[in-house]
Amino acid sequence: RTSSRHQDFKDAVAVQFALGDVLLHTHGHNEPFFGMGNRGKVVNIWQWRADWQTEIETKEKIEYATKGMDLDAMIFGGEVNPVDALNPFRDNPVEELNAEGFGTLTPQPRTKQNVLGKGVWKDGHWSVVLYRTLDSLNKWDKQFMNDQPILVAFAIWDGYEQDRNGRKVVSMWQRLHLP
């Protein structure tokens, strides 16, 4: 669950799709690395964050576990952070990103953010739904086509276990078949 205390870590979930024409476990393993892709093998990531949803629903700014000591706060100055005020994603708890390996995670521009979602906390567990139209004109989005398997992987951040950034539970690639 998400709280507004800075010492609490936040819950999140991400779904990752391999871009391009790749198949799981083909000769030569042409699929990207399941941990955020690798050079030349870009992945499309949809991340839902419980803290963003709480901010949207309560209109209350959440403190972070870094207690304002992250790079933005050091560069732009603590509580009054002009970069934070311009954050375009706070009307949606989901952010769409791309990566091609560690250290390359990049949010898509605001005009390309087309994934929506919502999480519901009930009986000590989150249920999260992420969605967008099947087709997309953005070349950095996964193109969903009927009768073609899709490579999908998942990541879960459990704030109670102090998960954050690269500390998370991840799955290997799975095949998803759309009817």
Residue ranges of model-derived segments:
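Mature, soluble, non-transmembrane domains
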Residues: 62, 67, 105-106, 110-114, ...
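Surface-exposed, low-complexity/disordered Ser/Thr/Gly/Pro/Asn-rich loops and linkers
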Residues: 85-110
